[in-house]
């Protein structure tokens, strides 16, 4: 089987939406019956985004096989059925790390190690490895054409056309076509200059995706085609839309998938986008709305919680409810009190690291528990719920996590020192272990407790969910906590680690150590988020009565 490659680049400005555009195109090609995957090449020098600040970089998306990756991989999984893996994302730092390791080992036999050919060869090897077994691979190159950091990646994808054949490679370039109100027209010159920059590197784009706040007129698309040496039918207008789920249909309506299939000589049936049309219908025709408060520490950048926000919206789709998300800084709860939580239909505390704002989260969990407000805790959100319950119900004064207070009297949350990874191998960690690459991360099996709320929501006894954490419930203190009324609703496959807790005497209080947001999609939703949003709607109705 021959694999075809679509290389996606961006020009003029950053944040044009390359990831969404690539994922939307992949969704159409998948709907035509093709085996599709997507890769993201990141030009930064960090080995992976695992230790990068969420406020700078956004969330870290975790794959099934335990890779800590760019948030764009979350977009990919929400648009196509193919599961991403560590092969779908790599950085400049990872490439240089691999090449330097080989140099130290003597693999290059004393040769002078250079960007060309050694770095570019390493990039190409990873692209080819990631593309194995697929009909079409979309490769998104991070950054903007013209950035110094991107040059080795652009050179590598230029060489790919020579090595795998021009008939199996296609260059798709996203560019900005701004509208100038004073002139009353869109301007194509930035696009022309961006393509000129690509040409100077040796890449002639085959498709231009023109981003604008309005549809780019046919005469302007013809002008772009003429000056950029691209067929007119390959100049696609991608205007701003009120829902990102409309983008696959928008691209299909302009024949982009037909053009690509003809270019690659792929005999594929017409795309059926009925599932996406259903998503659009559900989003446009809600039966009501709920307000959910998300209490975290990175709220100044919503992308830090991208998958959680999307998963809440998916939960809304499954319940025909519009979900309004109110982002609340947990430090505001500490300074202003629980007044900032008034008027919410449900409360969610997502994952996080570090002590800042933790006490505000503990106060939030108590407020939700005592006022019968639906509560969903994720990762740290489960740990603070446990701390709160231990303090205020069990009577363990100042119960805490050893992450925050190493010598606390009641360490209800402690460092995991040993567990099994996704392959069944034993992993061991200590307080001295590096921060990068040392967490319990990736898909882990969980056995659900019979007659629990989560068992009812999932509809099956065993699930697999993705983790990213170092600390877990301390089993030494668990019996006392369970005796006070807390239910352990899910445990790890070896029965050693607590994965889910519930409060049976509360209308809807669920907290999990894993990250369910990473497996939620607009077409399928996720049982926990669907149940959580449903509970928010029911709470709202009770308040009205």
Swiss-Prot record:
Enzyme class: ligase
Keywords noted in UniProt: ATP-binding, Glutamine amidotransferase, Ligase, Magnesium, Metal-binding, Nucleotide-binding, Pyrimidine biosynthesis
EC number per UniProt: 6.3.4.2
A biological process from GO: 'de novo' CTP biosynthetic process
List of residues binding UTP: 14, 187-192, 223
Signal peptide stretch: none
GO CC aspect terms: cytosol
Residues binding CTP: 14, 147-149, 187-192, 223
Domain Glutamine amidotransferase type-1: 291-542
Gene3D superfamilies: 3.40.50.880, P-loop containing nucleotide triphosphate hydrolases (3.40.50.300)
Residues annotated as catalytic: 379, 515, 517
Catalytic activity field: UTP + L-glutamine + ATP + H2O = CTP + L-glutamate + ADP + phosphate + 2 H(+); L-glutamine + H2O = L-glutamate + NH4(+); UTP + NH4(+) + ATP = CTP + ADP + phosphate + 2 H(+)
List of residues binding ATP: 15-20, 72, 239-241
Reported regulation of activity: Allosterically activated by GTP, when glutamine is the substrate; GTP has no effect on the reaction when ammonia is the substrate. The allosteric effector GTP functions by stabilizing the protein conformation that binds the tetrahedral intermediate(s) formed during glutamine hydrolysis. Inhibited by the product CTP, via allosteric rather than competitive inhibition.
Pfam families in the record: CTP_synth_N (PF06418), GATase (PF00117)
GO function terms (MF aspect): ATP binding; CTP synthase activity; glutaminase activity; identical protein binding; metal ion binding
Residues reported to bind L-glutamine: 352, 380-383, 403, 470
Residues that bind Mg(2+): 72, 140
Metabolic or biological pathway: Pyrimidine metabolism; CTP biosynthesis via de novo pathway; CTP from UDP: step 2/2
Quaternary structure note: Homotetramer.
Record family assignment: Belongs to the CTP synthase family.
HAMAP family: PyrG
More info: CTPSs have evolved a hybrid strategy for distinguishing between UTP and CTP. The overlapping regions of the product feedback inhibitory and substrate sites recognize a common feature in both compounds, the triphosphate moiety. To differentiate isosteric substrate and product pyrimidine rings, an additional pocket far from the expected kinase/ligase catalytic site, specifically recognizes the cytosine and ribose portions of the product inhibitor.
The protein's name: CTP synthase
Organism: Serratia proteamaculans (strain 568)
Lineage: Bacteria, Pseudomonadati, Pseudomonadota, Gammaproteobacteria, Enterobacterales
Designated gene of the protein: pyrG
């Amino acid at each position: 089987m021959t694999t075809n490659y679509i290389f996606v680049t961006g020009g003029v400005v950053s944040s044009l939406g390359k990831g969404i555009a690539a994922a939307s195109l992949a969704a159409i090609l998948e709907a035509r019956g093709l085996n599709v995957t997507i890769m993201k090449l990141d030009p930064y020098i960090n080995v992976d985004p695992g230790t990068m600040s969420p406020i700078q970089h956004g969330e870290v998306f975790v794959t099934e096989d335990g890779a800590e990756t760019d948030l764009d991989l979350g977009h990919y999984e929400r648009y196509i059925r193919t599961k991403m893996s560590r092969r779908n994302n790599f950085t400049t730092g990872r490439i240089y790390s691999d090449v330097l390791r080989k140099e130290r080992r003597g693999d290059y036999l004393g040769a002078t190690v250079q960007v060309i050919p050694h770095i570019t060869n390493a990039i190409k090897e990873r692209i080819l490895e990631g593309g194995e077994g697929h009909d079409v691979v979309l490769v998104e190159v991070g950054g903007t054409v013209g950035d110094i950091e991107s040059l080795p990646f652009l050179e590598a994808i230029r060489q790919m056309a020579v090595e795998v054949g021009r008939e199996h490679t296609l260059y798709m370039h996203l560019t900005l076509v701004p509208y100038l109100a004073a002139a009353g027209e869109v301007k194509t010159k930035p696009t022309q200059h961006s393509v000129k920059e690509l040409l100077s590197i040796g890449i002639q784009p085959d498709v231009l995706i023109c981003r604008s706040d309005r549809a780019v007129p046919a005469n302007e698309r013809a002008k772009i085609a003429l000056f950029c040496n691209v067929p007119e039918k390959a100049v696609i207008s991608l205007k701003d839309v009120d829902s990102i789920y409309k983008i696959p249909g928008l691209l299909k309506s302009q024949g982009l998938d037909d053009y690509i299939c003809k270019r690659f000589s792929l005999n594929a049936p017409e795309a059926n986008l009925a599932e996406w049309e259903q998503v659009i219908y559900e989003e446009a025709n809600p039966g009501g709305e709920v307000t959910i408060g998300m209490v975290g520490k990175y709220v100044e950048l919503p992308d830090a919680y991208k998958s959680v926000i999307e998963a809440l919206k998916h939960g809304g789709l499954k319940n025909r409810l519009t979900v309004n998300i109110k982002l609340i800084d947990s430090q505001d709860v500490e300074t202003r009190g629980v007044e900032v939580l008034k008027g919410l239909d449900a409360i969610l505390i997502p994952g996080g690291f570090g002590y800042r704002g933790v006490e505000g989260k503990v106060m939030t969990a108590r407020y939700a528990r005592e006022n019968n407000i639906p509560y969903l805790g994720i990762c740290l959100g489960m740990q603070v719920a446990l701390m709160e319950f231990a303090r205020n119900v069990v009577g363990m004064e100042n119960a805490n996590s050893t992450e925050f207070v190493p010598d606390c009297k009641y360490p209800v949350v402690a460092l995991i020192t040993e567990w099994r990874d996704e392959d069944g191998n034993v992993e061991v960690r200590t307080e001295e272990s590096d921060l990068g690459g040392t967490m319990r991360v990736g898909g882990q099996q969980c056995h659900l407790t019979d007659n629990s709320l989560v068992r009812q929501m999932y509809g099956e006894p065993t699930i697999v969910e993705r983790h990213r954490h170092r600390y877990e419930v301390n089993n030494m203190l668990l019996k006392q906590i369970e005796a006070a009324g807390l239910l352990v609703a899910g445990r790890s496959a070896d029965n050693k680690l607590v994965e889910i807790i519930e409060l049976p005497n509360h209308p809807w209080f669920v907290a999990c150590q894993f990250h369910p947001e990473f497996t939620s999609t607009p077409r399928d939703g996720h049982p926990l988020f669907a149940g959580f949003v449903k509970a928010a709607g029911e709470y709202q109705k009770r308040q009205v009565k």
